[in-house]
């Protein structure tokens, strides 16, 4: 049975790329019975009715799956955050990073609109972002003048399935247009009254860009931690990993426990205090959710 990759899902149809051809497929009824939904990024077996139409028959095992946006088998996430308009937001960035780390997806940070900053603002931003670089996250800086030049990003996309995410109004669609001008992704100017943009993408699609595939998605519509356990959160902060074995108590949540290596590292500056503050905020949010349900 032929195999292929779902590169687009729209109105109940799944568009499967296979050996240079694009086959418009419907899902088998058995998927509904199993409460299974084929996703963009799925490797599938399909049965062709003719050269252009067919049915998805089976879904290959996924290495990961995001629900909002609905996509599978993602290698890396390009997280776009602006230096200004809207302002750089570390709490929101850390929310994104936790969700990405939870699914074993490699993050790449892009800080856009850096030319809109005054010198003092640029110094403050550089200090904040340096901490993410020290953790090991790759970081690229771009300006509004560089918006049409994706040359620095292209090598990072090779042989990867990438998803672009970030705060509304930071230039995600503009970045995709620079990467794939033929795609003509719809963009919206930021609303100065609201201080944010609007998501413009309506469906999920994988675009061939450079030597890789980049997902044009409707964006992350939910950043809540509904599917995460409190004890799993710590593994989504890479700077904790080498220290956790030094905590006195096995299973330490690095909150109220005594002789905690993470809290000691915050005191010495080895772990950044605002990252730890965000960790505690997320931890208490997860614990409160579990108590409610």
UniProtKB/Swiss-Prot annotation:
Q: Which gene encodes it?
A: rsgA
Q: Which family does it belong to?
A: Belongs to the TRAFAC class YlqF/YawG GTPase family. RsgA subfamily.
Cofactors: Zn(2+)
Can you name this protein? Small ribosomal subunit biogenesis GTPase RsgA
* CP-type G domain sequence ranges: 63-223
Q: What is its EC number?
A: 3.6.1.-
Ion transport found in the keyword field: no
Superkingdom, natural source: Bacteria
Q: Indicate where this protein is primarily found.
A: cytoplasm
Q: Which GO terms describe its biological process?
A: ribosomal small subunit biogenesis
Annotated compartments: Cytoplasm
Q: Which residues bind GTP?
A: 112-115, 166-174
The cofactor note reads: Binds 1 zinc ion per subunit.
Function statement: One of several proteins that assist in the late maturation steps of the functional core of the 30S ribosomal subunit. Helps release RbfA from mature subunits. May play a role in the assembly of ribosomal proteins into the subunit. Circularly permuted GTPase that catalyzes slow GTP hydrolysis, GTPase activity is stimulated by the 30S ribosomal subunit.
For this UniProt entry, the molecular function terms from Gene Ontology, in alphabetical order, are: GTP binding; GTPase activity; metal ion binding; rRNA binding
Keywords tagged on the record: Cytoplasm, GTP-binding, Hydrolase, Metal-binding, Nucleotide-binding, Ribosome biogenesis, RNA-binding, rRNA-binding, Zinc
Q: Which Pfam families match?
A: RsgA_GTPase, RsgA_N
Query: For binding Zn(2+), which residues are annotated in this chain's numbering?
Result: 247, 252, 254, 260
Q: What class of enzyme is it?
A: hydrolase
Assembly, in brief, is: Monomer. Associates with 30S ribosomal subunit, binds 16S rRNA.
Quote the cellular component terms of the Gene Ontology held in the record. Answer: cytoplasm
User: What organism is recorded for this protein?
Assistant: Shouchella clausii (strain KSM-K16)
